[in-house]
Amino acid sequence: MPRHSVFALSILALSITATVWIPTVQAETNLLRREFYGPVNPELFAAFLDDHDARGRENQRDFSSGSGTNELVDELSPVSERETLERFGKRNIDEIDRTAFDNFFKRNLDEIDRVGWSGFVKRLTNYLATTGHGTNTGGPVLTRRFG
């Protein structure tokens, strides 16, 4: 028992140390990044965001693609880049992910419908009667009810 409590306390101490130490390490500025890009001026960053927000609102157009969403058109991008992006059709990712799931259950429901629920119940009662799993007092209870 003492070994268990020592182990639990050591795990607790390690987790507390990691919880305190990791965010402080991640919050420090990377020296390589600071040397490469230079110090970040907050005013420059705010001006950058303002410029891009204004530019985005000016170039926002509504396309009748059926989705009803607005898309940003970049007037400065070359035509070749836009053509490569437009080459791929717009697809709903949820639809793509659901198809395999839906097909699996549709197939199984079709198999049940072919046999019918009455056939399923008869096969279940026959199985339970022959294996003896459906007996309370030694006799086939389900066979007497449904058969």
UniProtKB/Swiss-Prot annotation:
Superkingdom as given in the UniProt entry: Eukaryota
Annotated compartments: Secreted
A GO CC term assigned to this protein in UniProt: extracellular region
Signal peptide (UniProt feature, chain positions): 1-27
Any one biological process term the GO annotation gives: neuropeptide signaling pathway
Propeptide: 28-89, 146-147
Keyword Secreted: yes
Protein keywords: Cleavage on pair of basic residues, Neuropeptide, Secreted, Signal
Family: Belongs to the orcokinin family.
Function, in words: Myotropic peptides.
Name of the protein: Orcokinin peptides
Species in which this protein is naturally found: Apis mellifera (Honeybee)
